[in-house]
Amino acid sequence: MKKTLGIIGLVIVTIIWGGGFVASDIALNELSPFEIMSYRFLIASILMGIFAWKNLKTISKDEIIYGSILGVALFSGFALQIIGLKYTTPSNNAFLTATNVVMVPFIAYIIGRKKLNKADIVGSFTALIGVGVLSLQSNFSIGTGDIFTLFCAMGFAFQIYLTGIFGKQIR
């Protein structure tokens, strides 16, 4: 029963995640990328304020610093994602955003000197093929939206990497 609920939960999260790209694409018809970002972060701030109100008084200086750094990485990822979506398709935007997962081990290798394993290399090579198939045009150039979206993936990859580092240093 727990496994079935877990699978259902993953399917629901996947639908919501994928639907977000289409919803953002539709929103871009009426709003600028930074208007979308403003609404997104305003709603998130209000919800976090409601749910974390009791914990706000106990936040340490380190948590504020780490949270700010993570916020910059996260904001960069979202901003570049929305800007990229303005110039590419929702499907390209979603796939290229998801390449952040294979970027994290390389960031860990470059910054933290963490050794790469075979799965990291094979996964990255496979993702690179997917990026090429989706993004390369007939003259082997890559579209503006796809470039923005790849940088968005880097922002999210840094956020994931730094969350792992900072999470070990605070409560």
Label the predicted regions.
Residues 1-35, 140-165:
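Glycine-/small-residue-enriched transmembrane alpha-helix faces in small-molecule transporters
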Residues 14, 48-52, 78-81, 108, ...:
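Structural signal for membrane-spanning alpha-helices in multi-pass inner-membrane proteins
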Residues 18, 38, 42-46, 128-129, ...:
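Small-residue-rich packing faces within the transmembrane alpha-helices of Major Facilitator Superfamily
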Residues 20-21, 49-97, 133:
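Specific transmembrane alpha-helical segments of multi-pass solute transporters/efflux pumps
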Residues 27, 36, 40, 84, ...:
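Hydrophobic/aromatic residues within transmembrane alpha-helices
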Residues 39-40, 70, 96-99, 119-122, ...:
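Hydrophobic core positions of alpha-helical segments in small-molecule transporters
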Residues 47-56, 100-122:
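C-terminal transmembrane-helix exit sites in multi-pass transporters
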Residues 48, 68-70, 116-136, 152-156:
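Hydrophobic transmembrane alpha-helices of multi-pass small-molecule transport proteins
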